[in-house]
């Protein structure tokens, strides 16, 4: 029994590393559903200053976006999305604030209710 416990304790660091590597490998092939989960569950404490996604309240996020001049986040501002993309915000033609996220070769728009991502061409 003691050997099994020691063996399992030995595997713990490798299992977290394996999960992290799997996430990195799956970035390009992640489905929209997975991206929603990544966005919602992102560890925003690791993000740099001016991170508007630290709050889980959609109203606070929308207010933060609205306070930025011209509806845009300053260049270099990082927004947590779990996939490591840089993000910024802008207002559409109807005056609604949306966040546009770039993931390497694809871009996605955060929906008005901040509940999901819509692929953009």
Question: At which residue positions do the language-model features occur?
Answer:
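Sec-dependent signal peptide recognition
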Residues: 2-8
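N-terminal signal peptide c-region/cleavage motif recognized by signal peptidases
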Residues: 13-15
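Mitochondrial intermembrane space
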Residues: 17-121
